């Protein structure tokens, strides 16, 4: 008994020591940040990785095949349910948290580049604060993101699809749900996003323009509320349609997965709740709900395939008012 207690105590001390060292490394990376721009992105990546355990990425051949099968099945089921044609990235990545940080440092840097273009010299203290904020945001997200379809906005490469395996494992355990079914559900959600961008070749450019306008306005000290509103409406359509088609296409029970995941979000500690609000995670949940209600009403009136008309051309996107009045959207889009 004493030996077991001693082992647990030693493991606890070792873990706390490791956490302390990692925290020191994260703080040191921020304080050592350099350059002239508003954010030292190299330091952001270093600090976020230091403050975040990478997680285990030891997968059996069966587990790797499970990811591949889930993605392939999701593609076929969503094509059939939604009546849209789309392709997936050539390779699906299964990542740990550090891999996700590395990929998204590049994304954040790309999206926020207008800030660097307009702000040539930044005081060291402000740069350290900006760097710390970005590192905290990425570290928090790296511990929570389960999967991600990346259309590579503002980039030149191919679209990407990846899953953060340690987070899927951890969430399935915390929620007390079957891991394989949970992983499959996440795959269907991310593939649903791939379907949207495949069905709407104009969508990446629209989002890029919205993001560039919003960030440029912020860099100039202003806030283009109309641009932000348009971006929010577009993202509400993106999130809502994905919810509709993943629910219609998924081949297993999922109500308990959604309920438990929502409970997990709502039951977070105060620091987590604050970060979710600052990062707009709560807004994304509202986008899910509002967008899904809109598309459910459209599907009920005319079928799931009719909802795909939203991606035929930019003008078919619902307005902010139409999101709460699906009949008005149906009358406008199908008046012919």
Where are these regions (language model features)?
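Catalytic Zn2+-binding segment of zinc metalloproteases
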Residues: 190-207
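Short pre-active-site segment immediately N-terminal to the catalytic Zn-binding motif
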Residues: 169-186
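Auxiliary, metal-adjacent structural segments of Zn-dependent hydrolase domains
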Residues: 70-166
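N-terminal low-structure segments adjacent to metalloprotease catalytic domains
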Residues: 1-103, 180, 306-336
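Acidic/histidine-rich catalytic neighborhood
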Residues: 205-242
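Short alpha-helical functional segments enriched in proximate histidine and acidic residues
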Residues: 77, 194, 198, 245
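Pan-zinc metallopeptidase signature
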Residues: 240-336
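Active-site rim elements
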Residues: 60-61, 225-233, 278-284
């Amino acid at each position: 008994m004493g030996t077991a207690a001693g082992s647990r105590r030693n493991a606890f001390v070792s873990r706390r020591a490791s956490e302390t060292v990692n925290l020191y490394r994260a703080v040191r990376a921020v304080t050592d940040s350099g350059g002239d721009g508003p954010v030292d992105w190299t330091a952001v990546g270093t600090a976020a990785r230091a403050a975040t355990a990478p997680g285990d990425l030891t997968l059996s051949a069966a587990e790797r095949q499970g990811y591949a099968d889930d993605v392939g099945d999701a593609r076929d089921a969503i094509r059939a349910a939604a009546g849209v044609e789309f392709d997936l990235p050539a390779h699906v990545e299964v990542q740990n948290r550090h891999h996700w940080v590395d990929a998204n440092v590049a994304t954040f840097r790309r999206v926020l580049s207008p800030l660097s273009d307009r702000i040539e010299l930044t005081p060291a203290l402000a740069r350290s604060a900006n760097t710390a904020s970005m590192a905290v945001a990425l570290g928090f997200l790296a511990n929570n993101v389960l999967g991600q379809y990346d259309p590579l906005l503002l980039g030149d490469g191919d679209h990407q699809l990846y899953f953060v395996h340690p987070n899927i494992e951890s969430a399935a355990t915390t929620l007390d749900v079957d891991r394989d079914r949970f992983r499959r559900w996440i795959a269907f959600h991310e593939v649903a996003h791939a379907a949207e961008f495949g069905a709407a070749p104009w969508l990446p450019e629209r989002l890029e323009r919205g993001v560039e306008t919003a960030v440029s306005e912020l860099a100039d000290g202003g806030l283009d509320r109309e641009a932000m509103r348009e971006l929010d409406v577009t993202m509400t359509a993106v999130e809502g349609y994905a919810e509709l088609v993943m629910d219609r296409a998924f081949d297993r029970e999922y109500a308990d997965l959604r309920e438990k995941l929502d409970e997990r979000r709502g039951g977070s500690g105060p620091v987590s709740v604050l970060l979710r609000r600052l990062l707009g995670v709560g807004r994304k949940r509202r986008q899910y709900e509002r967008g899904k209600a809109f598309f459910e009403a459209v599907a009920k009136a005319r079928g799931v395939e009719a909802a795909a008309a939203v991606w035929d051309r930019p003008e078919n996107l619902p307005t902010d008012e139409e999101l709460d009045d699906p009949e008005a959207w149906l009358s406008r889009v199908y008046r012919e």
